[in-house]
């Protein structure tokens, strides 16, 4: 099936209406472009990588590249808040646990001028009711917390539509050749690989199905990351329904995104054990569990580039959401430059 939009030099199609696709459409429409977004399910669906109430926002990364990108993203989120009239960020701070101070975010934060505190375990317990793992150091960074993910997607969507962008839901694009546009931006997440292959483009990513669990916890907990940079570390963040959302980074198996699967009970057990050991005020048993998709590159860096009339927007590896304002602007620039 060929998908026809208006003809003209500035016609751009975006395939995939997760947060990156919506951010790209918002940026393109803000620049006066003729934009059509194609989504195989519906905006806000639970089959991909963007669903759920919250995502971590943080400056704390061991690599300066990510710190600076997060610093660039923050004013983008604030501008979207002002435009939408909604609170999209809540920033009570983030605790980072690491076995090796030299592999923590300390040096990168210093290089980027971002504030932080190095805390003793007793200070962490007193301030946050969180236990520091034995043998680990604790770093607190205040420019962190959560992005309200569902609100953020709606804000990008409304802003794009208000500037003339069209959203075609329930339309699956099976081939780049089916899209009648001057430029096609592919932000299909775990489905991008198979779509790009139809244009002869090999995308070096591995989709995995990850498990998360929710726990009842009162108050505003800080976000927490523990050894994320060194492998399959744990992370936690506020959930507005249950209190706390917890996952184990990159612990899930490779998957076909067209298949659906239940949360992995073994991973839920591991998550529950970690949560019970760290969060003094969390109820011990999970209140719920869910899955999401990661689209992993070898080094967790994003693939944002143009090949002919195709722009590739693979910005995930399990940590992309916070960067959506930046990624959307960069993909829009690639599409129109």
Give each language-model segment a name:
Residues 62, 310-324:
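Glycine-rich phosphate/pyrophosphate-binding beta-alpha loops
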Residues 26-30, 87-89, 190-309:
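Active-site substrate-recognition segment that forms the wall
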Residues 140-174:
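Helical element adjacent to the flavin cofactor pocket in flavoenzyme catalytic cores
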Residues 4-20, 36:
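Beta1/beta-strand and adjacent pyrophosphate-binding region of the FAD-binding site
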């Amino acid at each position: 099936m060929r998908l026809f939009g208006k003809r003209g030099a500035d016609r751009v199609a975006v395939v995939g209406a997760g947060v990156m696709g919506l951010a790209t459409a918002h940026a393109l429409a803000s620049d006066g472009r003729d934009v059509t977004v194609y989504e195989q399910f519906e905006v806000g669906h639970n089959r991909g990588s963007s669903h759920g109430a919250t995502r971590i926002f943080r400056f704390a990364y061991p690599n300066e590249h990510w710190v600076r990108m997060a610093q660039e993203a923050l004013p983008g989120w604030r501008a979207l808040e002002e435009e939408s009239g909604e609170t999209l960020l809540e920033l009570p701070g983030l605790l980072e646990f690491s076995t090796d101070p030299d592999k923590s975010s300390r040096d990168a934060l210093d290089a980027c001028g971002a504030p932080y505190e190095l805390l003793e375990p007793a200070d962490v317990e007193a301030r946050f009711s969180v236990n520091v793992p034995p043998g680990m150091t604790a770093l607190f960074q205040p420019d962190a917390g959560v992005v309200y993910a569902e609100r953020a997607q709606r804000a990008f969507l409304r802003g794009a539509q208000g500037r003339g962008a069209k959203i075609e839901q329930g339309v699956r694009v099976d081939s780049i050749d089916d899209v009648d546009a001057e430029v096609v931006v592919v932000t299909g997440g775990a489905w991008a690989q198979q779509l790009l292959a139809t244009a002869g483009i090999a995308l070096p990513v591995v989709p995995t199905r990850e498990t998360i669990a929710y726990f009842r916890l009162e108050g505003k907990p800080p976000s927490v990351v523990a050894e994320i940079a060194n492998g399959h570390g744990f992370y936690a963040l506020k959930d507005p329904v249950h209190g706390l959302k917890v996952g184990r980074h990159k612990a899930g198996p490779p998957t076909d995104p067209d298949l659906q699967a239940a949360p992995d009970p073994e991973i839920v057990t591991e998550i529950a054990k970690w949560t019970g050991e760290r969060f003094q005020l969390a109820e011990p048993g999970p209140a719920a569990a869910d899955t999401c998709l990661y689209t992993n590159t070898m080094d967790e860096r994003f693939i944002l580039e143009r090949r002919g009339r195709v722009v590739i927007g693979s910005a995930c590896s399990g940590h992309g959401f916070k960067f959506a304002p930046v990624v959307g602007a960069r993909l829009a620039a690639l599409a129109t430059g």
